[in-house]
Amino acid sequence: MPLSYQHFRKLLLLDDEAGPLEEELPRLADEGLNHRVAEDLNLGNPNVDIPWTHKVGNFTGLYSSTVPVFNPEWQTPSFPDIHLQEDIVDRCEQFVGPLTVNERRRLKLVMPARFYPKVTKYLPLDKGIKPYYPEHVVNHYFQTRHYLHTLWKAGILYKRESTHSASFCGSPYSWEQDLQHGRLVIQTSKRHGDKSFCPQSPGILPRSSVGPCIQSQLRKSRLGPQPTQGQLAGRPQGGSGSIRARVHPSPWGTVGVEPSGSGHTHICASSSSSCLHQSAVRTAAYSLISTSKGHSSSGHAVELHHFPPNSSRSQSQGPVPSCWWLQFRNSKPCSEYCLCHIVNLIDDWGPCAEHGEHRIRTPRTPARVTGGVFLVDKNPHNTTESRLVVDFSQFSRGNTRVSWPKFAVPNLQSLTNLLSSNLSWLSLDVSAAFYHLPLHPAAMPHLLVGSSGLSRYVARLSSNSRIINHQHGTMQDLHNSCSRNLYVSLMLLYKTYGRKLHLYSHPIILGFRKIPMGVGLSPFLLAQFTSALCSVVRRAFPHCLAFSYMDDVVLGAKSVQHLESLYAAVTNFLLSLGXHLNPHKTKRWGYSLNFMGYVIGSWGTLPQEHIVQKIKLCFRKLPVNRPIDWKVCQRIVGLLGFAAPFTQCGYPALKPLYACIQAKQAFTFSPTYKAFLRQQYLNLYPVARQRPGLCQVFADATPTGWGLAIGHQRMRGTFVSPLPIHTAELLAACFARSRSGAKLIGTDNSVVLSRKYTSFPWLLGCAANWILRGTSFVYVPSALNPADDPSRGRLGLYRPLLRLPYRPTTGRTSLYAVSPSVPSHLPDRVHFASPLHVAWRPP
């Protein structure tokens, strides 16, 4: 007869009318009983003959393709001009006095962040934008391009201008300026002619610098003043002779994809005085001088015909405008859906490429990408805005994978010990937190995103046209991409983007200037950065609490008025460092804080309501007596595991599920096991914070017997049959708890100390978890354990009771930094009337 739920509860001693613990509990350690119960609950036999269930409610297998939904109305979020101040360490020191070694080290990690992959695999540009939405190819292409353009404009990306140079917008950092003579200068190869490289020229020359500045630049160069200099610096807009007249002026010569046909004449693009011994036109097109507003340079009309058709359509704008988009202007319409109808809508489509305000030399950057991008909803609650997903998973795969640094995340108990208090809470929202942290330009060649341009993208995805790799002179090839779908999409997009359609239809390669989200290094760096800032804030306001996990920052203070003034001070401090906060998203929580999926109040911690609802839904949809795919079980265990510490039996209750996942077997829920779990998760108990105290109760065991020391009382007992030592120690701890009711127990067994009961026999683990819930353990060396003698059957010998103080842990999260004395020359910080006379320390 299968085991009923009531009987099972009784077996686990979850009901009050159980017999004496010393008799009942050791029985649960019996292997035979555990096997019989497992068989009764149908836990151990995978029914292979029934097909597996692959979906339970919203849970599908871990690798299932849950298709993201494309939204043609997505708004691209705006990115404020995020610029973290470079002298962040000095600013923090002005705020709080000398920084601790820990804080300084963490802030140095992100100014600038560095990234050293072992191997970087370069992918063709076609893979730049992932064809995630086959129904909305063109729309997705333009939305993604617009998103990337927005990021570039906000100073978050570099734009590759040529193999060795990149441009960007926003304020430059010092390491972006001394790249010329820093270690990053890659010696130009022989075919590039080393002589022309000018070491004195600064890495950045803003576009606004005109004439005189350039002349002085040239005088400094070791080539000396050249005859071309006057002619170049003083030429009016649109100067360089006959070639210039026929082209669209673009302020810089080299664009996204470098022409593969360039010979030895194109010398390192950004050194300001390079190639002065060459023709004026070519110098204007290639050297940095062309950034000045005095004369905008053109593409390389001279070598137009050596380019393969797709590598650099973008910049060859000579007598035949070989820009794919503009070529439609002179062609005959092939049908009513021909693209030339769109191109002829306006005369001025703007430049083929835009260039940043600053330009730097970079290590060699191929015309490739290293990761693909696509768009998804910003989050489940906000489907109007899009979010860019960057896939740099190549760095986490294979045997060349980068092992990302590990960092401490507080566990549930540490978090409760720290934050469970009677403070008022408020949480800050850092907008685009990852994009605050600058990356060293040397990392740019490893983190490239981009696209091959609209023509390639459409050609690759449409079945009827082929990518033509030979010369594409004929108009027929040009019109290969015309189709009704493309025409309709572009007409609709024209309303949104206007003449930007032209700009976005060109190939582009962008590298990250701030840390991207798709790299395992980023969470680590963000955690280091915010925890260092919180440490500084905690030392500046010792009677308050500031704590962060990634971009989630919470502030706590004794009263609401106090909290508001703290909020004002901290906000101003963070703004002065260049951090961007989102004031609309500041949440005031009162006395119960919502953080990391938990609700934390003075009573302890519970999971947030939406997680409780998810669990209820999961049990409603859970099928009985049907084998469930182990990948779906992973999802179920992930959800239940989060709330397990709040249940009676905790993680041990989920052990059968874990075992199945490890064996990659399907799992079948019997009605009793499902009812048991459901009951467990319907009544959640808060995890309370641990209190410091003195340990008065000690437990010890040998394989054959147990002993307790409760105050001056000693007790002992024997087991019916010898047990493994860990099991015996666990039983002794349970007896100590049930006999004395003490919340602090001394033990010399490390497994019991760890409070992880999943390695014990299943039934015993479940029962012990409930008996020992809320108990704290203190380690006592065996030699000093007063319960050692009773456990060996000797009651006559009394060891003196130890004075064992217990201090709850707050984990390795460097939460509380003791403030160093403030040097005398700093003005005394003015304290508002604090509700506390003494500095408050975390509990």
Swiss-Prot record:
UniProt EC number: 2.7.7.7, 2.7.7.49, 3.1.26.4
Residue positions binding Mg(2+): D429, D551, D552
Activity regulation (UniProt): Activated by host HSP70 and HSP40 in vitro to be able to bind the epsilon loop of the pgRNA. Because deletion of the RNase H region renders the protein partly chaperone-independent, the chaperones may be needed indirectly to relieve occlusion of the RNA-binding site by this domain. Inhibited by several reverse-transcriptase inhibitors: Lamivudine, Adefovir and Entecavir.
Segments for region (Disordered): 219-258, 297-316
Residues marked Priming of reverse-transcription by covalently linking the first nucleotide of the (-)DNA (site): Y63
GO biological process per UniProt: DNA replication; symbiont-mediated suppression of host innate immune response
Keywords: DNA replication, DNA-binding, DNA-directed DNA polymerase, Endonuclease, Host-virus interaction, Hydrolase, Inhibition of host innate immune response by virus, Inhibition of host RLR pathway by virus, Magnesium, Metal-binding, Multifunctional enzyme, Nuclease, Nucleotidyltransferase, RNA-directed DNA polymerase, Transferase, Viral immunoevasion
Key word Nuclease present: yes
Region annotation (Polymerase/reverse transcriptase domain (RT)) ranges: 347-690
Transmembrane segments: none
Keyword Acetylation set for record: no
Catalytic activity: DNA(n) + a 2'-deoxyribonucleoside 5'-triphosphate = DNA(n+1) + diphosphate; Endonucleolytic cleavage to 5'-phosphomonoester
GO molecular function: DNA binding; DNA-directed DNA polymerase activity; metal ion binding; RNA-directed DNA polymerase activity; RNA-DNA hybrid ribonuclease activity
Signal peptide: none
Region annotation (Spacer) ranges: 178-346
Domain of life (superkingdom): Viruses
PANTHER family: PEPTIDASE A2 DOMAIN-CONTAINING PROTEIN-RELATED, POL PROTEIN
Domain notes: Terminal protein domain (TP) is hepadnavirus-specific. Spacer domain is highly variable and separates the TP and RT domains. Polymerase/reverse-transcriptase domain (RT) and ribonuclease H domain (RH) are similar to retrovirus reverse transcriptase/RNase H. The polymerase/reverse transcriptase (RT) and ribonuclease H (RH) domains are structured in five subdomains: finger, palm, thumb, connection and RNase H. Within the palm subdomain, the 'primer grip' region is thought to be involved in the positioning of the primer terminus for accommodating the incoming nucleotide. The RH domain stabilizes the association of RT with primer-template.
Family classification: Belongs to the hepadnaviridae P protein family.
Note: Hepadnaviral virions contain probably just one P protein molecule per particle.
Function, as annotated: Multifunctional enzyme that converts the viral RNA genome into dsDNA in viral cytoplasmic capsids. This enzyme displays a DNA polymerase activity that can copy either DNA or RNA templates, and a ribonuclease H (RNase H) activity that cleaves the RNA strand of RNA-DNA heteroduplexes in a partially processive 3'- to 5'-endonucleasic mode. Neo-synthesized pregenomic RNA (pgRNA) are encapsidated together with the P protein, and reverse-transcribed inside the nucleocapsid.
Name of the protein described by the UniProt record: Protein P
Gene: P
